[in-house]
Amino acid sequence: MSEMTPREIVSELDSYIIGQHKAKRAVSIALRNRWRRMQLDEALRHEVTPKNILMIGPTGVGKTEIARRLAKLANAPFIKVEATKFTEVGYVGKEVDSIIRDLTDSAIKMVRLQSIEKNRFRAEEMAEDRILDVLIPPAKNNWGQAESTPEPSAARQAFRKKLREGQLDDKEIEIDLAAAPVGVEIMAPPGMEEMTNQLQSMFQNLAGQKQKARKIKIKDAFKLLIEEEAAKLVNPEELKQQAIEAVEQHGIVFIDEIDKICKRGESSGPDVSREGVQRDLLPLVEGCTVSTKHGMVKTDHILFIASGAFQVASPSDLIPELQGRLPIRVELQALTTEDFERILTEPSASLTEQYKALMATEGVDISFTADGIRRIAEAAWQVNESTENIGARRLHTVMERLIEDVSYDASEMNGQSVTIDADYVRNHLDELVADEDLSRFIL
């Protein structure tokens, strides 16, 4: 798991997300507390439960982006789910338990990759030996078995040197490689994905691991053999134990659009996709044991981060028990013109950088002036105010409209330069921004 300090986490998030300092501080402290908890003795560690977070803010201000970037920083099992995809147990739709199953699957994949990376050096040596066995077959005894020689021959060493230097990369060899598993597609009704996965695993295990002779270039064979040999060095049972422990101790679940499962108004009858989902989420958030195909997983110490716009509903519309399980509330602010300006220029791979790079592939040099960027930001803010406020996503719409002519003619403009200043922006956008009906449908 990540050992970054809260200040380092916030600094890293600042490279991609503008503003929202309170939300960044909250998630950075929560992430650091995961590390702090692991430094405690076992008896006390078991008593320290994570403080789950509820992020509240309008659409397009960075809630989901914080989750995406946090997933990369966490170096821990992480899953992002949409609350609207789930229904109450017993009804058609995904059950909330599938969140933990998916989290465990992602942990298995993460631990397997780490284990393969750890054994890469040995796997490379074993892959080299298999290729050399094809290039220089070992001597055989009277029973047709390969003789084990105490010292490798000079010819074998010479070929190993050539192989490492890449001199044999384009040479084709015929070698036995693991055959691709037969894909078994099983159609199952919604909510029965777990049964489908188990049936697919069963059919693949019945087929067994077969070898198939393939004619392939050495450089391609080397990559496949490394994966094959590294997989042999991984202990499946140990892998499952490590993955389950990683989920239980370091797992993070991000639940987006939680405001969409709030109960609205007085209604009779079962509300299976709203209040029913909240009731099913409760045991997960407060701690229970979920059965997965890899084993039983306890959710007591999994960190849950929920987010929602809460434009129609409010956090108080969540059932009281779930409100109590999300003790840390963070409100994200709506974006201003100044925020839009910074979003266009400051983050890594900002929108302006992306468009410059895209047009450079056609030999067109695009440059943005400070007053041009200011005018783009003002146009985006103005449209958000007069129509629906969709936050920073409005910049994508405005930029596409602005660059449309250049994008269309770029293939015929090789070697030309285009400067996007305030006048250019006014000529291309002002008419649309001023006409509310046009901006509603086009921007």
Curated annotation (Swiss-Prot):
N-terminal signal peptide: none
Pfam families: AAA, AAA_2
GO molecular function: ATP binding; ATP hydrolysis activity; peptidase activity; proteasome-activating activity
Principal subcellular localisation of the protein: cytoplasm
Record bears the keyword S-adenosyl-L-methionine: no
Entry GO terms, CC: HslUV protease complex
Annotated binding of ATP, by residue: I18, G60, V61, G62, K63, T64, E65, D256, E321, R393
Keyword Translocase attributed: no
Subcellular location: Cytoplasm
Subunit structure: A double ring-shaped homohexamer of HslV is capped on each side by a ring-shaped HslU homohexamer. The assembly of the HslU/HslV complex is dependent on binding of ATP.
NCBIfam families, A to Z: hslU (TIGR00390), PRK05201.1 (NF003544)
Entry's family note: Belongs to the ClpX chaperone family. HslU subfamily.
Function: ATPase subunit of a proteasome-like degradation complex; this subunit has chaperone activity. The binding of ATP and its subsequent hydrolysis by HslU are essential for unfolding of protein substrates subsequently hydrolyzed by HslV. HslU recognizes the N-terminal part of its protein substrates and unfolds these before they are guided to HslV for hydrolysis.
Protein's UniProt name: ATP-dependent protease ATPase subunit HslU
Gene from which the chain derives: hslU
